[in-house]
Amino acid sequence: ASNLQEWQDAMNMRSIISFNGIYADKEGNIFFIHNSSSPKRLEGLDWKEVVDGSRSKYIWNDYVALNEIPQILNPSSGWLASTNQDPFKVSAPSDNLKKENYSATLGLQTRMTNRAYRIKELFMENNKISEIDFDNFKFDNSYSKSSRSYKYVSTIFDKEFEEDKLIEGQKILKDWNLKTDLSNKSAALGVCVLSPEWLAEQEGIAPPDTEEVFRDCVYDLSLIHI
């Protein structure tokens, strides 16, 4: 494809059945599509549950048209960011699509990743972005205070501990600037505590008890540094 129309025509072939796409060209166009080859399903059913496959009206035979799946062209904010997140939170709030305008049968994800929160924060905090800024955004290694990870870690902040090591570990977490660069001495404990939550989310199970994870991390890291 050499222009936006050709790119959209290529996407309309539906050869790529998944994977979000963001397009940009020398003309200044930017375009987001929450790409999918989604079945055209009967409305009014919870398709996450078991559906009676013996009834013909529940059997789908076609795909939802490309223009019926979430997409944004040239938002006024001037930016788009897609990092495996809610397709209704890929630009500034004034430019985002409205969930109620799309069929619930699409089964669109609503999760937000830490990367999604961070890139949104970085774009929203900066009205003008240089090429250097853009590179820094790309390689940002911070956790967002809006992320599940931070909310999980922060449950440790108000707990009362008696052991000196746990009190010290709690202070390290409270003082952590949420960055994970090589020289960040707090990152080891922070990432150790939040990692089980991330793994649990990936597996679709409840996260483990934060205090137990914190205790294990503090003592495991203490042994490493003896």
Segments and roles (model prediction):
Residues 25-224:
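Long, compositionally biased non-active-site segments enriched in small/hydrophobic residues and glycine
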Residues 2-13, 119:
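Alpha/propeptide regions of enzymes that mature by internal proteolysis
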Residues 18:
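Segments that shape or occlude catalytic/ligand-binding pockets
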Residues 12-15, 158:
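N-terminal cationic-hydrophobic initiation segments that often serve targeting/anchoring roles
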